[in-house]
């Protein structure tokens, strides 16, 4: 049986950030860690022939400086929720959770985690954009900031920054079940806390190390009770045995705890992924059922066959609309990939 190191048993630190205050703060929180100085994070992160599957059991941490910009226009497979100036930010790369279907496994060459400690430079880059227009920014697409907040403190800093800039709205997306954060942070109506919620079967089979679905639901309720706008993301929907029963039970569990009328909005979408990412994931995970499903290729993106996709999405629309007004339910269709569609009431 393989013996793995514990998570972050090894920390690689770029020489240029060894004296950075955030580097020191992070290292102070880690015990029994081997610290290795490196010239550039890509020397470790971009090495050839890494096994993401193996690294997921013993992730290393890389502390680095981003010098090439961290703010990007939103990708077409991501939901903009009707926001015109939709961007996302990469202040971290990779996630401490290990969801088999996650596109990060296809996008990055490594399973290790990179934290860019020069958050002040990212804020400066964003302020230059904010001087030109209002921005809707997803800050937690390429990592789960909430899950690693105890180590980085980035969530607190993003909330404080957003409160100072009235033309900025951010989304912080998570699968973490932490309830303790939100009552300790001052709420802002432009900081949307988005929880990805899955059926128990999907979470148990594919969302390794992530918080259990009921823990996420409780955390979402804590965020709402603390004054934060909360988005629930039933996205991606994963096809599984008895999917109707699984998703029906999940919806019942969610809305037995959460008042749907108080949600900011809801996201629904079936699994979809770039063909290039899936090709890489299949090579690394040949035994994964979710990765090796016979998807259809639509304009360079893989999705479920039309009969499965439409059945799943229509089922969820009907189930969720019993609790949430349809003008607050969003769904992305790869048929119209440039924009998500806001659902209209079904007559």
Q: Which stretches of residues belong to each language-model region?
A:
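Cysteine-centered iron-sulfur cluster-binding motifs in ferredoxin-type domains/subunits
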Residues: 89-99
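Flexible glycine/acidic-rich beta-alpha junction loops that bind and position SAM and/or redox cofactors
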Residues: 205-207, 238-243, 263-300, 338
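Conserved non-cysteine loop/helix-boundary elements of the Radical SAM core domain that shape
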Residues: 111-117, 142-153, 179-183, 191, ...
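Conserved C-terminal portion of the radical SAM core fold
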Residues: 216-277, 323-331
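Single conserved hydrophobic/aromatic residue that forms the stacking wall/gate
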Residues: 335-347
